Amino acid sequence: MLDIGTASGSAVELRVVYGSKPGVVCMMDLRGQLTEALADRYRIERKLGQGGWAAVYLAEDVERHSKVAVKALLPTLAELLGPERFAQEIRITSKLQHPHILPLYDSGEADGVLYYVMPYVNGQSLRDLLDDELRLSVDESLRILERVAHALEYAHGEGLIHRDIKPENILLQDGEPLLADFGIALAVSAVGVERLTQTGITVGTPDYMSPEQAVGARLDGRSDVYALGCVAYEMLAGRPPFRADTSEEMMVLQVRQSPPWLRNSRPDVPRHIARAIERALAKSPSHRFASPSEFCRALEGTARVRSWSQLRGRLMKLVGAAALVVIVALVWWFAVR
């Protein structure tokens, strides 16, 4: 959380608690614990990545003979949650069933480590795609945004706010987006922002963080709309709305500064689409779209005609069809005279 009154942040030292003793995270120990405790169910193969609150490993499901991703909460968060509360919260998250949300297969406690299991997506993330191509076409961007917006709308209806929408959490399987990692929603709903930030755990990602999330205010689904607007901007412009050297500076920009007009860096984006993204990035939640589906409808409503050349082509086809009808009518009229 950022204290805007200081216009900077304050670095928080990350200390990890094992029981009542502070210590340092040893990821090899975490992997070793998982490997030993889950040996009869999952064969841990390698580490895929680590964030501020969890580490994820590639594993093989021993029974299904399929690849899965095992996400293990770091000891700090595991200590705050506890196994009983974790089980209650993961039960809510596991009920999410949507074609564009990555499902949960399994969860539990293994030798003190809290974990959950997801399908392994053997593809790339939106981040990988943007790293390769820098920016996407208008059509491809809108296709991805539409599906993610529908997934978010469903999750919000189930009472869950994602809180960490970013390209890394949008996985692409055969080109279809899957929204991953509702774990941060689970953690925040169970523990609370204040307790998490006090331990040094980052809640969300500054480049895509809504102003209200940056200052630790109460959130609703419009915070996810803002983050999705940041992703939309990056897909089309080739960079996020803001650039900063530190997380604290980035959060100040999210709170205080308006993003550059999208069409300055991407003139071929239709004006109404740029306006829709601009509204999604409004500083005040009340000035944004009320829901992801409303944002999606605004994009769809302005996406039917991409350019004047396409409009001209459609008009020419209509004119040609009308002319053909007139000719047929004249031929028939002369024939029956």
Give the label of every model feature segment.
Residues 268-281:
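Conserved C-terminal C-lobe helix
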Residues 2-7, 13, 17-24, 303-337:
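C-terminal or otherwise distal, non-catalytic regulatory regions appended to signaling enzyme catalytic cores
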Residues 288:
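Conserved HRD-motif arginine in the catalytic loop of eukaryotic-like protein kinases
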Residues 14-16, 20-260, 320:
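Conserved ATP-binding/catalytic core of the eukaryotic-like protein kinase fold
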